[in-house]
Amino acid sequence: MENLIEEILKQIGEDPNREGLVKTPNRVKKAYDFLTSGYKADINQLVNGAIFEENTTGMVLVRDIEMYSLCEHHLLPFYGRAHVAYIPNKKIIGISKIPRIVDVFARRLQVQERLTDQIAQAIQETLDPLGVGVVIKAKHLCMMMRGVEKQNSELFTSSLLGLFKTDPTTRSEFLDLIRTGSH
């Protein structure tokens, strides 16, 4: 990958041997390795048995999970917050695992719509809950830095499964909870 980054530098008219750019190909490689580390992650290994029998029936919500990803169309970042909730079906998951699941899918080349669905589906497959709700609000640098150059636009996406999709009361509770004091 480093040779390719060096070639990009040459193609845009830069000197890859210039003092400030000598280590850039290696730095970019390391950055992309980290930013795309979700391809190498395994959800079952990540959860690592942190699923517990519990008879609770109330909604479980982790709100305002900071996330960032790379737009697959321009390789530019998008960033924002994810809100992830589920209704337990005799099982709960360690709460730190939910942001980790968000990171697994965010650390891939993405579109926000698919990212939202993948997070919801992973929670559904891992826990078999009565329902899952995921909402992501993000700013896309591909819209801010190029193209339409809209600095204040935000994209909202949602994925609703089970009770979140079929039961208006569950859906309303979820949306009310993420609105209250949300960033």
From Swiss-Prot:
Pathway in which this enzyme or protein is active: Cofactor biosynthesis; 7,8-dihydroneopterin triphosphate biosynthesis; 7,8-dihydroneopterin triphosphate from GTP: step 1/1
Any one cellular-component term (Gene Ontology): cytoplasm
Keywords: GTP-binding, Hydrolase, Metal-binding, Nucleotide-binding, One-carbon metabolism, Zinc
Binding annotation for Zn(2+): 71, 74, 142
Broadest EC class assigned to this enzyme: hydrolase
Listed GO MF terms: GTP binding; GTP cyclohydrolase I activity; zinc ion binding
Superkingdom in the source lineage: Bacteria
A Pfam family matched in the record: GTP_cyclohydroI
Gene: folE
Subunit structure of this chain's protein: Homomer.
EC number: 3.5.4.16
Keyword Nucleotide-binding: yes
Gene Ontology biological process terms from the UniProt entry: one-carbon metabolic process; tetrahydrobiopterin biosynthetic process; tetrahydrofolate biosynthetic process
Catalytic activity as recorded in UniProt: GTP + H2O = 7,8-dihydroneopterin 3'-triphosphate + formate + H(+)
InterPro entries reported in the protein's UniProt record: GTP-CH-I_C/QueF (IPR043133), GTP-CH-I_N (IPR043134), GTP_CycHdrlase_I (IPR001474), GTP_CycHdrlase_I_CS (IPR018234), GTP_CycHdrlase_I_dom (IPR020602)
UniProt cross-references to Gene3D superfamilies, sorted A to Z: 1.10.286.10, 3.30.1130.10
Designated name of the protein: GTP cyclohydrolase 1
Organism: Leptospira biflexa serovar Patoc (strain Patoc 1 / ATCC 23582 / Paris)
Similarity comment text for this entry: Belongs to the GTP cyclohydrolase I family.
Coiled coil feature spans: none
Disulphide-bridged cysteine pairs: none
